[in-house]
Amino acid sequence: MNNVLIITGPTASGKSKISVKIAQDNNGIIVNCDSKQIYKEIPIITDQPKLNDYSVKHRLYGYISVTQQYSVGLWIEDLKKEILSATAEKKLPIITGGSGMYINSIIYGLSQIPKIEDDVRYKTKKLFEDLGNKEFYALLINKDPLAKCLHQNNSHRLLRAYEVIEQTGISIFSWKKNTIRQPILNNFKLCVLLPPRDQVYKTINERFINMINTDVIEEIENLLSLNVPKHFPAMKAHGVPELISYLKNKISIDEAIETAQKNTRHYAKRQYTWFKNQFPNASFYDSKCQLLESIKNYQN
């Protein structure tokens, strides 16, 4: 798959807006690379584009239910279809988003871990729900000592590690280390937008206030009504845990706002370091104007 643009960077760095401008100038289609913006029930809290506002096509936004099991492997298959479709239409695919695991899988490929059987997946989830994070973590590292590097509160990765060791008898970390990974793309330009941090932090704070002033509370109430298991990815989207705590009368709305803003800022701070370490050969930009100028007239 040839001639693809990847626009990434920390949350609230301005990726979406700059991607629209690039798409307008280069006959492009925007394809989502944000692991939370795939969910159709939570467009406000995940800051999904308002598709009717734009004159360019957007793909893979709000098309998966929060109740569905989804993975980076499934997303890669959906991505391939969208790139082929864009190429057939003679349009430039512009992959946009900040989910590190998704971007890493595009550039370096996926480890060839066997598909997990449904019964193993079900039993693992049931075990996790019965034991809770702490006891489940202890059980996991007893079966797979390499899993000690995982944080016991990262339930998504704990479940995945347990499923793999349970079905294959081999640590997920051994699979990743010892299998050959095939890159998804052959010819692409990776652009990382890294504006000044204080600018990003300011945007994070303002964006969450704007969400509160819209229908985000109603959106989270609806999410709660779906009884989604708390370890599902959608339940960990920025702002969701804090607003759920507010709706359950555990904290005030002011505390929810302040905590969500703080946690999102901390996440953005980690993203700055992660992008620089993971993609040293990428093109880095500290402003949207600089990025626009560098890829002017980037054509298929």
UniProtKB/Swiss-Prot annotation:
Family matches, as Gene3D superfamilies: 1.10.20.140, P-loop containing nucleotide triphosphate hydrolases
Keyword check for Nucleotide-binding: yes
Region span, Interaction with substrate tRNA: 34-37
Binding site for ATP: 9-16
GO terms of biological process kind: tRNA modification
UniProt site (Interaction with substrate tRNA): 99, 121
Molecular function GO terms recorded: ATP binding; tRNA dimethylallyltransferase activity
Source species, domain of life: Bacteria
Catalytic activity from the UniProt record: adenosine(37) in tRNA + dimethylallyl diphosphate = N(6)-dimethylallyladenosine(37) in tRNA + diphosphate
Keyword Acyltransferase included in the entry's annotation: no
Residue sites binding substrate per the record: 11-16
InterPro entries: Dimethylallyltransferase, IPT, P-loop_NTPase
HAMAP family for this protein: IPP_trans
Family, per entry: Belongs to the IPP transferase family.
Protein name listed in UniProt: tRNA dimethylallyltransferase
Source species of the chain: Ehrlichia canis (strain Jake)
